[in-house]
Curated annotation (Swiss-Prot):
The species this protein was found in: Legionella pneumophila subsp. pneumophila (strain Philadelphia 1 / ATCC 33152 / DSM 7513)
Keyword Nuclease appears in the UniProt entry: yes
The protein's name: Exodeoxyribonuclease 7 large subunit
Family matches, as NCBIfam families: xseA
EC number(s) per entry: 3.1.11.6
Amino acid sequence: MSSQLPILTVSQLNRQVKGFLENEIGLVHVEGEISNLSKPSSGHYYFTLKDSTAQIRCAFFKNRHSNSLLRNFNDGQQIVATGKLSLYEARGEYQLIVEEIVKAGMGILYQRFEELKIKLASEGLFNPERKKPLPRIPETIGIITSPTGAAIQDILSTLARRFPIARIIIYPSEVQGQTAPQQLVKALKLANAHKRCQVLILARGGGSIEDLWAFNDEYLARQIAISEIPVVSGIGHETDFTIADFVADYRAETPTAAATAVTPNCIELFNILDTAIYRLHDAIIRLVKGLQLKLNHLIDKIASPRQTISTYWQTLDYLERQLISAMTQFINLNINKVNIFSTQLQANNPKTQIERTKTQLRQLIMQLNQEIRIQVNQLKNQLSTNLSTLHAVSPLATLDRGYAIVSKNQRILFAAQQAQIGDTIDVRLAKGSLACEVTQIKD
């Protein structure tokens, strides 16, 4: 026996082997058949994973499998278990501490899914800022799904209940199988080419990962990203996620939820419309009242025709007095001159010259009197013209022709609908006014 090697106890050896297995080998994926599956009350699962020539004990602890599909697995099924190797020291048995279980054959699909997810995410296809907003009230809704599946019926019934006025266009496509991705892309391109829809629903019912695999196609994801029409995905159930969900402008948990997401609720919409109509009616009432106040203010600012005529009469009287005063001064001045001339003539006693001067004086007085009459007549004519003009534009002239001004509460009425049966209205005539009661309203 070599003296250089330490002597270990069984426990020490098992502990070293356990440390080596856990720290050096790391995470492994192991495919095999389940056997001896045990589900004790502790919540931990124990089973053996075997192939044709070997087997390994596996432990799947409760804190790891709470969301696992293991409850649906049974003895004899092929799975891929992912976990770390360890050693059960008490018996010296090494085992696999399982962290995840999938059906055999699904490991590659999950790997492809994660690789594509990372690739598209790095290109920014999942970024929220590149996603298009959904229309609030779409006129036409496009549906890309199988025309015979349960999903289309759920969508149509939801749309009919929430927003029956929307037009529906169905773009049929396979949603499962090898040709499904190409058909989904074709339907998406066709909807964009038509340009008739404001939003598209990409949907199918629930299923296994293989059933939903068509929606993990890279080319389909890129077509969703460049679609000019917003795309809402409603694929599978709430726990199902596909690449199409990440790229879509909005991800709904189910086809029914997708139909709900793209439509407004009719009752809520009617309430919004009622509120808008009430606000519009209130705004119109306020506008009309404001215009009525402005009109009344303008009417109050218009000068009374009688007051205007009175002002002109006063001006005319003033001008007449000024004219008479000027003429009187002029006559008196000339009389004084005549008297002076008469005195001078009498002093010289030139009888002939006096007679001639008297004759000239009489003619001058006649001319002055004639000029005064002409000036007075012209002023009277001008005054008459002004009075006629004022009378023509005066509301009083309209009243003189048999018309009347009707008012209610000192506000002029322009239409019969401004009064109601039983109202008391004032009717102003050319001479006097009447207080009347409305007994009938005619259009």
